[in-house]
Amino acid sequence: MDIYKFAVRPLLFDLVKADPEWLHQQTMRSLSWLSHTSDRTSTKWVQNILQKSLCLEDSRLEQNLFGLRFPNPVGLAAGFDKDGVAARIWSSLGFGFAELGTVTFVGQPGNPPPRLFRLPLDQAALNRMGFNNHGAAVMAARLADEKGQFSIPIGINLGKSKVTPLEAAAEDYLNSFRLLKELGDYFVVNVSSPNTPGLRSLQDASMLSSILDVLQKENNSHKPIFVKIAPDLEWEAIADIIGLAKTYQLAGIIATNTTIRRDGLKTQVIEQTGKAPQEEAGGISGAPVRDRSTEIIRFIWQQTQGEIPIIGVGGIFTPEDAWAKITAGASLIQVYTGWIYQGPMMVSQILTGLLSKLEEHELNSISEAIGLEFKS
């Protein structure tokens, strides 16, 4: 029996009605403690239990991409470990890679609470966090102390500081990258969060090109750089970004961030505010973005014939969800909202399901499944 799904989650969500952000903070405190006391006998015991319960190793799930070894294709999406306080523990929870951040050059408190809401009827979350984090320098100091101690690739998601005007965005991203470039395995240019005023305008080709230009000029260590896009873009805008990815030799595209659309939601009123989701600012993640993110993955694959790697994220709850994104063209996938709803067993359940899919389709490795929709 999945204790989290049938006991812990109902207790926290329905009976205690714990505030989502408070619950997240308590979770991060616990994971941070585990991550930074790993030399203690008691902590090692807990980590061993986690690894035995939550990790699944199989060579068919391994991939070598952008010069990095991924033990499995399921990663933690950005937004969960904003300051990298638990970076060493994610491998013990079964993840094949983890993306830290979003981090900004200037530390900032984010938007005022309440700013995180569950929409259980829609298997979704609505957030307007606003890139709350302690800043790139603080993350850099923390990761420098732990350098060489990670058993999975660690990505860093970079955002624009709220105090920085849009016309100075390129320098702001560059300042963060300079502090962190030797400490992350790959980097993500986040220009798609709806919760920083004007940020999504940086997805415009002229604005985005200035950011990518300065980053790649600085990128003498040749770290893989991705751009993360919104699900609400028109096809023409996505095609423009694909062109930039080729021009600036990006490692790939992450599809997608949260959506600002509200159509089709079952939730009528958000309990914490008494308002409808349509009245609340913020981005929606989870099941409502599932199909759109997969459509965009499929579009990118078709436009590039699979030449640009894609990390697929949005509405992944089950092995079938993961398989749909991989066969549409995603080399890797990331989870966040689904992990909150499904619990810590979710990663191993998805990996087990993916292995079953490989056997069903008589494939020898997960890499053979990438873009399977388009292979005869």
From Swiss-Prot:
Record note on cofactor: Binds 1 FMN per subunit.
PROSITE patterns hit by this protein: DHODEHASE_1, DHODEHASE_2
Subcellular location: Cell membrane
GO molecular function, one term: dihydroorotate dehydrogenase (quinone) activity
Amino-acid positions noted as binding FMN in the UniProt annotation, renumbered to this chain: A78, G79, F80, D81, K82, T102, N157, N190, K228, T256, G286, G315, Y336, T337
GO biological process: one example: 'de novo' UMP biosynthetic process
Record-given protein name: Dihydroorotate dehydrogenase (quinone)
Organism: Nostoc sp. (strain PCC 7120 / SAG 25.82 / UTEX 2576)
Gene: pyrD
